[in-house]
A protein has these predicted regions:
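Glycine-rich, low-complexity intrinsically disordered segments
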Residues: 1-99, 103-135
Length: 135
């Protein structure tokens, strides 16, 4: 298999600055944040509107890529579980998936939330949430 190449399209600007500050999920008290899209890609935002539900895909540069099993939600009372059966950021390809709402649009910047990503997290893609799978 050939190596895949993914280039960031933007970055998250958040008041969360460490893994310890980040909630496990966006729905668990995460703040809103700015998603700054590279100016050269701003035209790709055409069609997005305030109130849209989108999925933001991020790359977790601080994640451990050699982790194969974790205690779900860091709870050692639970059994060790393969990372593909969890939402752990530590995994062979540390891609984050964040369902968020567009709160504001200013040129190449989207105010989105709630999102548990750390300030400086690279964004690799944005996709609309569709009413039904595969629509």
């Amino acid at each position: 298999m050939r190596g895949a190449q993914v280039r960031p399209i933007g970055v998250i600007r958040s008041r969360i600055i460490s893994r310890e500050q980040a909630p496990k999920q966006g729905s668990e008290g995460a703040p809103d944040a700015w998603l700054e899209v590279k100016p050269s890609l701003a035209a790709a935002l055409d069609g997005l509107a305030v109130g849209d539900e989108i999925i933001v895909l991020t790359w977790f540069p601080r994640a451990r890529r050699d982790t194969l099993k974790v205690y779900p939600r860091s709870d050692r009372r639970r059994p060790l579980t393969g990372v593909f059966a969890t939402r752990s950021p530590d995994r062979p390809n540390p891609v984050g998936l964040h369902p968020v709402t567009v709160r504001r649009i200013v040129r190449n910047r989207l105010r989105i939330g709630p999102i548990e990503a750390i300030d400086g997290t690279p964004v690799v893609d944005i996709k609309p949430q569709l009413p039904t799978p595969n629509s």
